[in-house]
Regions:
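Short edge beta-strands and adjacent turn/loop segments
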Residues: 30-43, 127-133, 222-237
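N-terminal, positively charged regions that mediate nucleic acid binding
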Residues: 1-35, 270
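Glycine-rich, mobile lid/loop segments that gate access to catalytic sites or pores
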Residues: 38-44, 64-175, 271
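Short beta-strand elements
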Residues: 38, 130-145, 174-192, 233-244
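A glycine-rich helix N-cap at a beta->alpha junction
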Residues: 56-76, 150-158, 239-266
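Glycine-rich anion/phosphate-binding loop at the beta-strand->alpha-helix junction
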Residues: 143-216
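Short glycine-rich or small-residue beta-strand-to-loop segments that form or flank ligand, phosphate
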Residues: 2-8, 37-51, 140-142, 187, ...
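Internal helix-turn-beta structural module
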Residues: 221-281
Length: 281
């Protein structure tokens, strides 16, 4: 069973806002240091950004308006400089910004679920949450602002489909408050607690997570783990329990940079999490 939400789920709205703000920071300097937390719901958005760059309020308000449809008066923005100790750690180059344990185990069902969620999200421009059981050819589709007949017309590949168990619903940020990095189980094939969104590439949570998922996929679903401590310039890498060497963190950053660029940016990454719509070696 695989859970997936579409890009209009409140938590993904928060992720997309955070991702767009990170994109904005990268438009200002090549390697910003930024971490963004977003809480959005019921006509309000609260944003806290720890950043090495100054974010123009009107740009941030424009991002929130575009993604969440909120007016600029409903946005509370708090900016703070990056902690001096954390800044010093990255002053001379890319080094792991935190302790971390990362794991990935790719499987084709996740990619199929991601493709379906994106397809449904392109048809129903509204909050949606899905459960896919490809072994039983079954699905539970909770899709707001859509009729049962419209949903059944789309979900034709499943023999057993449960649609909106509680009946029709409206969803969105007026029904449920969204928060950054609260849908990590939907965003990667093997759930980890490492936050993927609202962070620059110097954060191991982002770069190492992307790398281990890519390695696992390339190896056909091997169980890949990585360990790092704050300040490390290399990361211990294990495949199916066997240590295979160390990965230069700077190389992980550049791989992740290329991945994010090819995908279309951090906002695009935030829509559906890890995805491989193209070949990236």
């Amino acid at each position: 069973m695989i859970e997936k939400v579409n890009m209009y789920h409140p938590d993904k709205v928060a992720d997309r806002i955070a991702g767009a703000i990170v994109d904005y920071a990268y438009s200002l300097v090549p390697n910003p240091r930024i971490a963004v937390e977003v809480l959005v719901g019921h006509g309000h958005a609260a944003i806290i950004a720890e950043s090495s760059v100054i974010l123009e309020r009107q740009v941030v308000e424009g991002i929130v308006g575009r993604i969440a449809g909120l007016s600029k008066g409903s946005v509370k923005l708090v900016q703070a400089p990056q902690d001096s100790h954390l800044a010093a750690n990255q002053a001379s180059g890319f080094r792991c910004g935190d302790n971390g344990v990362f794991a990935a185990k790719w499987h084709p069902g996740y990619e199929r679920a991601t493709t379906l969620a994106a397809e449904y999200g392109s048809i129903f421009i509204a909050d949606g949450k899905y459960m896919f059981d490809f072994h039983r050819n079954a699905a539970t589709i909770c899709q707001s602002n859509a009729t049962e007949s419209d949903i059944r017309a789309v979900a034709t590949e499943f023999e057993n489909v449960t649609i909106n168990p509680l009946g029709a619903w409206t969803g969105g940020t007026d029904a449920d408050t969204g928060a950054t990095n609260r849908k990590l189980g939907s965003d990667q094939p093997f759930c980890n607690p490492n936050g993927l969104h609202g962070k620059d590439l110097s954060k191991a949570d982002v770069s190492i997570s992307i790398c281990v998922n890519a390695i696992s996929r390339k190896l056909g679903g091997a169980f890949v783990k990585a360990y790092c401590s704050i300040g490390d310039e290399e990361v211990d890498l294990f495949v199916d329990g066997v240590r295979v060497g160390r990965l230069e963190f700077s190389e992980a950053v550049e791989f992740a940079r290329s991945y994010i660029t090819d995908l279309g940016g951090f906002e695009k990454f935030a829509e559906y999490g890890m995805r491989w719509d193209y070949e990236h070696d």
